[in-house]
A protein has these predicted regions:
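Glycine-rich, proline-tolerant flexible connector loops at the mouths of alpha/beta enzymes
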Residues: 42-52, 101-122
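Active-site mouth loops of central-metabolism enzymes
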Residues: 17-26, 74-90, 106-110, 137-144, ...
């Protein structure tokens, strides 16, 4: 049931969290955190998303803030996330993820080359050692030809999978056939979370692994249903959420994630400040499955400008009207 707009707005705060390194082209992550009867929750669709796409994110916020969810485990394993940085920054960056034995490495970033990607992945493999799991994420930026060429060069680093190497489901299916002999599984992320039909990629035989995110799929309950219907291994990941949204992801991961994989929920390490003093940071390679209590002084310290706050509150109002129909 959709709460009244007044209920959503009664304890709602817009924050702008500074990031240690540029990620997804941004250096500040804006989010709206709000308090429901079940606890703090989050609404943080990326600013470029339209209201129709943002609607799932509001459903997720309501699902987590207005419904009770029991933790299915005490903690979940998480991966380190390596942005498109130079190899000499890799060791310091990985040190922010103590105990993590899986790393996700961003590749195909605009302005970088495949040589840059190879050097970065090689350094991650060197620092973490031969037994660690290394995955790459291209965010759909390669063509089929570029992806095939890049993955041929990256395959010797023993990749756990390549996440969203190409943008469309037909491209993923074509690439998967073409590189079948390489031993690099394909994972789908954008093809799940940005699709009107998140299971199309599974039916098309276009992926070996699904990456699922709580907010874009409409919340824990909706995402769990996608996982159950997919029939593929699933990895739960963050949408660069604050620690509040990471808590939502951790609840989902504890319930729905395939064993043997680490969740992409260690991303609080990418912020210089968060909404809670007890941020959901990785310890011994894991994050706890718990609701995060927000600190009022951090809400104040990280408050977005009045203009940005007004923009987010207007967006919340429009998306609420869309869901209220």
């Amino acid at each position: 049931v959709l709460p009244d707009l007044d209920d959503l707005l009664s304890d709602a705060h817009v924050v702008a969290l500074p990031m240690r390194v540029r990620f997804r082209g941004i250096t500040v992550r804006e989010a709206l955190v709000l308090r429901g009867p079940a606890g703090w929750t989050e609404f943080s669709p990326f600013v470029e998303y339209d209201d129709a796409e943002a609607a799932a994110w509001l459903r997720a916020a309501v699902d987590f803030g207005w419904a009770t969810h029991e933790p299915a485990a005490d903690s979940v394993p998480v991966n380190a996330t390596v942005p498109a940085i130079a190899p000499d920054g890799v060791a310091d960056l990985l040190a922010r993820y103590p105990g993590c034995t899986t790393a996700k490495v961003k590749v195909a970033e605009p302005g970088t080359t495949i040589d840059d990607d190879v050097a970065r992945v090689a350094e991650v493999r060197r620092v973490l050692g031969p037994s660690a799991a290394v995955r790459v994420d291209a965010n759909g930026l390669w063509s089929v030809d570029s992806a095939a060429e890049a993955l041929e060069r990256l395959a010797p680093f023993d990749l756990q999978y390549a996440e969203q190497p190409c943008r469309t489901v037909p491209e993923l299916a074509e690439l998967r056939q073409r590189i079948a002999g390489l031993g690099v599984p394909i994972a789908a992320d954008e093809s799940v979370r940005k699709a009107s039909d998140p299971l199309a990629v599974a039916r098309a035989g276009a992926a070996d692994v699904l990456v699922v995110k709580a907010q874009p799929l409409g919340g824990i309950t909706a995402a769990r249903a996608v996982v159950a219907d997919a029939g593929l291994p699933c990895v739960v990941s963050s949408a660069l959420d604050t620690s509040v949204g990471l808590g939502m992801g951790a609840f989902l991961a504890a319930e729905a994630m395939s064993p043997g994989y680490a969740a992409g929920l260690g991303t609080a390490a990418m912020f210089t400040s968060d909404v809670s003093a007890a941020a959901l940071l990785p310890v011994d390679g894991r994050v706890p499955v718990r609701r995060v209590e927000v600190d009022r002084d951090l809400l104040e310290r990280n408050a977005a400008s009045p203009e940005r706050a007004a923009w987010w509150l207007a967006r919340l109002e429009r998306v609420h009207a869309l869901l209220a129909g």
